[in-house]
């Protein structure tokens, strides 16, 4: 396989760097033909195809699916808050003298978990009402 690549690579390089239009890469040939502007009738046909009721229904269905998927993060936030305060209770039961430090860490964990839930909820509302 490696020997075949060694034989083909010089031929491919010479074909790419050649000036003949026949051996140019396909991308170089197609960019020259794209300079011709398209007819206005073709553009309006494409534009009317994109605004059908089927397309609008698909867009709204995708919007609802995305909002539902973004709402799943709110449930994860609730589970995270429960885990944080459950760990606070376990830590306080093991060492009551660290009550103040454990509580400050629990509040920090609560805030971070709640922020992630609010970001997920915000994305769901943005998908529903802004797009």
From Swiss-Prot:
Stored InterPro entries: ATP_synth_F0_csu, ATP_synth_F0_csu_DDCD_BS, ATP_synth_F0_csu_sf, ATPase_proteolipid_c-like_dom, F/V-ATP_Csub_sf
GO biological process: proton motive force-driven ATP synthesis
Sorted UniProt keywords: CF(0), Hydrogen ion transport, Ion transport, Lipid-binding, Membrane, Methylation, Mitochondrion, Transit peptide, Transmembrane, Transmembrane helix, Transport
TM region(s), chain numbering: 72-92, 107-127
Transit peptide start and end: 1-56
Modifications after synthesis and translation: Trimethylated by ATPSCKMT at Lys-99. Methylation may be required for proper incorporation of the C subunit into the ATP synthase complex and mitochondrial respiration.
Gene Ontology terms: cellular component: mitochondrial membrane; proton-transporting ATP synthase complex; proton-transporting two-sector ATPase complex, proton-transporting domain
Site location (Reversibly protonated during proton transport): 114
Membrane topology: Multi-pass membrane protein
Residue numbers bearing the N6,N6,N6-trimethyllysine modification: 99
GO molecular function, one term: proton transmembrane transporter activity
Location(s), subcellular: Mitochondrion membrane
Assembly mode: F-type ATPases have 2 components, CF(1) - the catalytic core - and CF(0) - the membrane proton channel. CF(1) has five subunits: alpha(3), beta(3), gamma(1), delta(1), epsilon(1). CF(0) has three main subunits: a, b and c.
Family: Belongs to the ATPase C chain family.
Task of the protein: Mitochondrial membrane ATP synthase (F(1)F(0) ATP synthase or Complex V) produces ATP from ADP in the presence of a proton gradient across the membrane which is generated by electron transport complexes of the respiratory chain. F-type ATPases consist of two structural domains, F(1) - containing the extramembraneous catalytic core and F(0) - containing the membrane proton channel, linked together by a central stalk and a peripheral stalk. During catalysis, ATP synthesis in the catalytic domain of F(1) is coupled via a rotary mechanism of the central stalk subunits to proton translocation.
Protein name (record): ATP synthase lipid-binding protein, mitochondrial
Upper classification of the organism: Eukaryota, Metazoa, Ecdysozoa, Arthropoda, Hexapoda
